[in-house]
Amino acid sequence: MSGASSEDSSIFARCEDVDCNKKIPVELVRMHICYAMFHRTLAARGFGTQTQAKKKPTNKKKSTTSLTDFAVFMNHFRKSFRTDYNGALVKEGSKIGWEMWKSMTEDEKKDYLDKAADEEDEDEDTVEEQADDSDDAEDNEVKETDDDN
């Protein structure tokens, strides 16, 4: 600390650091922590500079969860409910659909279970195809950059 001066009957000193340049009472000079110098030291050591890893682009069309057999049934039921009960509330349709599902036998439910399994297989196939396509695109991109060098 340097530059002691008299101000309001107290003696102050300025911090020698260019970025800090604060006035500090001489009695408290030893207690002064110069955060500007502290941050520069950390930056010189590599702290505070965050490098972001490259993220692979995610496919927004990818289904996060597959449909259950009940969901497949409700999708089918809603289509028929709209035509049969024109003007009824959606809430009523959900209640009626749930009551119908509970009253169905296991054999009737099995059809919807099979449809749900088929849709899940189709979803997995499309996800695999899209993953293969994106891998091929990345490989082509790498080859192009290698050819440029």
Swiss-Prot record:
List where this protein forms a coiled coil.
none
| SMART domains to which the protein is assigned, alphabetical | HMG (SM00398)
Locate the compositionally biased regions of type Acidic residues: 117-149
Can the keyword DNA-binding be found in this entry's annotation?
A: yes
Sequence segments annotated as region (Disordered):
111-149
Compartmental location: Nucleus
What GO cellular component entries does it have? nucleus
One Pfam family from the record: HMG_box
Organism domain of life: Eukaryota
Name-wise, this protein is High mobility group B protein 12
Species annotation: Arabidopsis thaliana
What is the phylogenetic placement of the source species in the record? Eukaryota, Viridiplantae, Streptophyta, Embryophyta, Tracheophyta
